[in-house]
A protein has these predicted regions:
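Short hydrophobic/aromatic beta-strand or adjacent loop that forms the aromatic wall/cage
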Residues: 38, 84, 167-171
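Conserved hydrophobic/aromatic beta-strand scaffold that supports enzyme active sites
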Residues: 40, 132, 171-173
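A short, glycine/Asx- and small/polar-enriched loop/turn
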Residues: 48-49, 75-83, 125-132
């Protein structure tokens, strides 16, 4: 999605992220992003919809808004309350995560990166000579590292605990 319920502050980064994923996919010869749209459904006065609508207006994002009757016709798979509306972010969609990882890894390798698989990272320490990575298989040094630890980021990099927060979101993907 590009119209962010977290607020307009995120929209430029989301737009740029979308461009970068499209570029990566084009370089890989495969579509990483599937342009399916992103539908938000809530009562019309729900606080999460206001920032989404503000992002749409401020950045003139392509979208569609459906009232409850239109939602029931277009999306019969959902139980729609009378005061619900649907906001369809036409730039939203789904990502193929395995393909994204493969494409990003291939691109990193083409720029001289290396990877160590099936190894638990215990610690990452910045040193005057670069980065020291302590693992279950020993220590490695590098000029720089890319950390993609997902929900383990705060444990691995405790200094980011206040900045990086893992949240679970329930998502539903449906075929038209």
């Amino acid at each position: 999605r590009v119209a962010a319920k977290e607020g307009e502050l995120f929209t430029p980064a989301l737009l740029r992220s979308r461009e970068l994923w499209q570029e990566l996919g084009a370089g890989y010869g495969r579509d990483i992003l599937l342009p399916a749209g992103a539908l938000s459904v809530a009562p019309s006065d729900h606080p999460d919809l206001q920032p989404t609508l503000a992002s749409i207006e401020h950045f003139d994002l392509p979208h569609k808004i459906f009232d409850a009757a239109q939602m029931r016709l277009r999306f019969p798979q959902f139980h729609i309350e009378d005061d619900d509306i649907g906001v369809l972010d036409l730039l939203g969609g789904a990502m193929r995560p395995e393909m994204a990882v493969a494409a990003a890894t291939d691109q990193a390798f083409s720029h001289g990166a290396s990877a160590i698989y099936d190894t638990e990272v215990l610690d990452i320490v910045e040193t005057s000579n670069g980065v020291l990575v302590r693992t279950s298989r020993g220590e490695f040094t590098a000029d720089r590292v890319v950390v993609t630890a997902g929900p383990w980021t705060a444990r691995l990099l405790p200094e980011l605990r206040d900045v990086v927060q893992t949240k679970t979101f329930a998502l539903t993907w449906l075929m038209p």
